[in-house]
Amino acid sequence: MTSPLFEPTHIGDLPLPNRIVMPPLTRARAAQPGNVPTAMNAAYYAQRASAGLIIAEATDISADAKGYSLTPGVHSAAQIAGWKLVTDAVHRQGGRIFLQIWHCGRMSHVDFHDGALPVAPSAVAFAGQIWKAGQYAQGGMVACPTPRALETAEIADIVADFRQAALNAIEAGFDGVEIHAANGYLIDQFLRSTSNQRSDQYGGSRENRLRFLLEVTDAVTGAIGAARTGVRLSPRNRANGMDCPDSIPTAVEAAARLAERGVAYLHTNEPGDDSPEATEVRQQLRAAFPGPIIVAGGYTRERADAVLASGEVDLVAFGKLFIANPDLPARLQHGWPLNTPEPATFFGGDARGYIDYPTHITTEEQPA
């Protein structure tokens, strides 16, 4: 039986040869100073160009957006030039690549902001930790401070930063952008009543909590077109103080509003289970959003086939498997064995654990 994973589809106006997505994966290997993408990053993404779609790692829309060490930006001329190396390399291999753009909000540290507090919808601290590198890029997890609540007038500036980042991404050669509204970062912080305790037009009711996401979406689609704009949500993310009692209906309402705007796709990530809630949420999102839906969350080939056959989603993203298997689509299609990822090399470092994972053909053709 033919797997639906290998059927062609499209995202906006972009034809895709298969339904296998490489999702955004923070790898913390941008060059310093300046958080600039490099030729090594270009090699990494080009190795994985057989994905139906690559969504490049979460990228800062501004210097103020930063929340982790060694992550790239798309707000300086050097960064745009660095990303052009990446997109050119992927396109030469016949691939397709979007860029995920983000603002970390409260998931940040004063060291990234010259001693100033990170900003957020409200002065509510993030309950978890973020990764911060030391003097020699030796990383470690550190607690986040209580953020400063954004003034109402400042929010428009961040919307403008998202718009400019999208324009910069297109200048750098990306086929589109993904707005990161998931996983507890700034837009998600606005969506949740646990992190958003504002009393102005951006807080309180669900309508108000959706406002920032929709303003960002309108700004980005107005700049580069809806067909080149995707959005990521995480309705079932309840970790680190994000357990909002209406997170699922808020995400479903967001999906409906995004559908009205004609965005290219909706991307959701799941906790990686097969619970009844997972199916219910996928069905609700499908009812609200008729366009392409990408799902991520620890999927195997078998689970991916099943969820595609259900009609609840259209494409499946594979994160850790793509880290270790640059030729993942071929391995999945032919049933070839998979390389095992090396977690110690996920964040920071050099080529080891980044561009040195072998392809299956390379493995099989090693001389005796």
What are these regions (language model features)?
Residues 1-368:
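Flavin-dependent oxidoreductase catalytic cores
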